From Swiss-Prot:
Top-level taxon of origin: Archaea
Family, as annotated: Belongs to the universal ribosomal protein uL2 family.
Pfam families linked to this entry: Ribosomal_L2, Ribosomal_L2_C
Keyword Ligase: no
Gene3D superfamilies associated with the record: 2.30.30.30, Nucleic acid-binding proteins (2.40.50.140), Ribosomal protein L2, domain 3 (4.10.950.10)
Name by which UniProt lists this protein: Large ribosomal subunit protein uL2
Annotated SMART domains: Ribosomal_L2 (SM01383), Ribosomal_L2_C (SM01382)
GO function terms (MF aspect): rRNA binding; structural constituent of ribosome
Key words of the record: Ribonucleoprotein, Ribosomal protein, RNA-binding, rRNA-binding
Region (Disordered), start-end ranges: 196-226
Originating gene: rpl2
Record-linked SUPFAM superfamilies: Nucleic acid-binding proteins, Translation proteins SH3-like domain
């Protein structure tokens, strides 16, 4: 008798697969639209599961919110937010008011969504240009892709602190374990071909062998490995590279 494979168990959403959100201070997002004024950095904290430091900011009206800390931000620094905010490191500006060439992070895709782009440690986006007639701002994302976003959206000036974190090696498997635990990742991951046949479609046999591509319409439990792929192997990669050229 077979058993449910790992991807099926993960899809069910058991407690061991859920992200431990109760360990976090709260959502990292901007205050409601229309919020403007000055504030200051109350504290810079570490939040389990996030790969960048988080700044706790308190505004003049008493409202507090969490935002990713900019490189060089310090406790007690004055922060401006709104249309009148100057493009200084740590300030939350409206994209339509940001000068061309400004480095920003935690960029909103739609006004009021709290920030969607450039949120990882050490990343930033660049304001490339403005389209006032269409109320759009052109932003170059960390991937190099340019995107038009609503000019009424907000972003923080600077780059996210915590850059270079991936340059430090893990060294021990135990560190990887605790990193995965903070993010609710399954660790260690066992290869399907190393399992028994009752546990995975790639398991079993007197020797290990690769699986075959699976149809997109295959039922859950069969959908592992290459799903609906047109071609596989080294020749496939070469063919795609030639097509791009």
């Amino acid at each position: 008798m077979g058993k449910r494979i790992l991807v099926q168990r993960r899809g069910r959403g058991g407690s061991q697969f859920r992200s431990p959100s109760w360990r976090r201070e709260g959502p990292v997002r901007y205050p409601p639209l229309g919020t403007a004024g000055r504030g200051y950095v109350v504290d810079i904290i570490h939040v389990p599961g996030l790969n960048a430091p988080v700044a706790k900011i308190r505004l003049e009206n008493g409202l507090e919110f969490l935002n990713y800390a900019a490189e060089g931000l310090y406790v007690g620094q004055e922060i401006e937010i709104g249309e009148a905010a100057s493009p200084k490191t740590g300030n939350v500006v409206v994209l339509g008011k940001a000068p061309e060439g400004t480095m920003v992070f935690n960029v909103e895709k739609r006004p009021g969504d709290g920030g969607k782009f450039a949120r990882s440690g050490g990343t930033y986006a660049v304001v490339v240009g403005q389209k006032p007639e269409e109320n759009k701002t052109i932003v170059r994302l960390p991937s190099g892709r340019t995107m038009e976003v609503d000019a009424r959206g907000r972003a923080t000036v600077g780059l996210v602190a915590g850059g270079g974190r991936i340059e430090k090696p893990m060294v021990k498997a135990g560190k990887k374990y605790y990193r995965a635990r903070a993010k609710a990742w399954k660790y260690p991951l066992v290869r399907g071909k190393a399992m028994s046949p009752y546990a995975h479609p790639h398991g079993g046999g007197s020797h290990q062998k690769g699986g075959t591509p699976v149809s997109k319409t295959a039922p859950p439990g069969q959908k592992v490995g290459f799903i609906g792929s047109r071609c596989t192997g080294r020749g496939c990669v070469r063919a795609r590279a030639q097509q791009k050229q």
